[in-house]
A protein has these predicted regions:
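Beta-strand segments within the central parallel beta-sheet cores of soluble alpha/beta enzyme folds
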Residues: 1, 24-29, 107-115
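Glycine-rich loop/linker segments at domain edges
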Residues: 8-95
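Short secondary-structure boundary/hinge segments and terminal tails
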Residues: 1-2, 34
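Short glycine-biased active-site loop of nucleotidyltransferases that positions the nucleotide triphosphate
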Residues: 3-7
């Protein structure tokens, strides 16, 4: 038995970069399973908390985020163990790795350029 669970998000995203690896924008669409009912902080996790953290450590002139929350027959979501930070960090770091591969650049070089 539990009173809340961690986040269940599906995130679709796009990162825009110049050919030299400079990040120019990020678009994130979040589909969030909110559980059977909302706790007091649950709506903030995929919206205010998560989306504001998507720049990570990088200079990023434009971030656009859209969130859709869905009530389901699962345990309600609540904030614990990072509350949006793990999702945001994984997403932006994975996008940087993919961008480096597509631009045939060293991922560390892209990270340094945008730090």
């Amino acid at each position: 038995m539990t009173d809340s669970q961690g986040r269940d998000h599906v995130q679709n995203c796009k990162m825009a970069l110049k050919s030299d690896g400079t990040i120019t924008g990020l678009y994130v669409e979040i589909h969030a399973d909110m559980g059977a009912y909302l706790s007091s902080i649950a709506p903030l996790i995929p919206t205010v908390i998560c989306i504001t953290l998507f720049s990570g450590l990088y200079k990023n002139p434009g971030i656009w985020g859209e969130t859709t929350g869905t009530l389901t027959n699962t345990v309600p979501v609540d904030a614990y163990r990072g509350a949006g930070r793990p999702e945001a960090s994984f997403l932006v770091e994975r996008l940087v790795d993919i961008a480096a591969q597509e631009l045939d650049m060293d991922p560390i070089e892209i990270r340094r350029k945008n730090f």
